[in-house]
């Protein structure tokens, strides 16, 4: 019976911890900063009881407000810095995974294909050679020349190879 009672308490604790509002409240950095500030203020007032004198009471209140503002800025800076690091790491993971997806593994890099206008400009700059003899109309192209590859096969070779 005692073991069942302890197991029930542990199960209840797990249910409370996994409850959505409780879980997200401790993931919110602003709420964490407020909790830490409240704990520091409680400790501050427990150690230093404010004096009864009115002038000293005002000075103590000013010091308390300065401490509150300083702690909030400190928590904001530290938590914002940590969140920025997490955000930058997650962005780098997204960038790296998109590069791997683009090149399908990252090892094989597909060279960019130059547009046809660039190759035409290069050919126009060179002087054209005119053959010396007459060319028969039924002549076949030389065996050295390669046949043209369809453009789709150049862009997406993986679809045609499979």
Curated annotation (Swiss-Prot):
It is a multi-pass membrane protein. It comes from the Viruses. It is found in: Host membrane; Virion. The keyword Glycoprotein applies. Keywords: Glycoprotein, Host membrane, Membrane, Transmembrane, Transmembrane helix, Virion. Glycans are attached at residue 88. Belongs to the asfivirus B169L family. This is Transmembrane protein B169L. It comes from African swine fever virus (isolate Warthog/Namibia/Wart80/1980) (ASFV). The lineage of its organism: Viruses, Varidnaviria, Bamfordvirae, Nucleocytoviricota, Pokkesviricetes.
């Amino acid at each position: 019976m005692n073991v069942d009672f302890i197991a029930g308490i542990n199960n209840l604790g797990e249910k409370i911890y996994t409850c959505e509002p409780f879980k997200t409240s401790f993931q919110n950095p602003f709420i964490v900063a407020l909790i830490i500030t409240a704990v520091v203020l409680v400790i501050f007032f427990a150690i230093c009881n404010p004096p009864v004198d009115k002038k000293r009471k005002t000075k103590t209140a000013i010091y308390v407000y300065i401490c509150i503002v300083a702690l909030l800025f400190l928590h904001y800076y530290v938590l914002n810095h940590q969140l920025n690091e997490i955000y930058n790491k997650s962005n780098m993971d997204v960038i790296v995974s998109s590069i791997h997806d683009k090149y399908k593994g990252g090892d094989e890099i597909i060279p960019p294909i130059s547009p046809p206008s660039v190759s035409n400009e290069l050919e126009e700059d060179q002087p054209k050679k005119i053959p010396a003899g007459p060319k028969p109309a039924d002549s076949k192209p030389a065996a050295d020349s390669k046949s043209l590859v369809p453009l789709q096969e150049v862009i997406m070779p993986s679809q045609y190879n499979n």
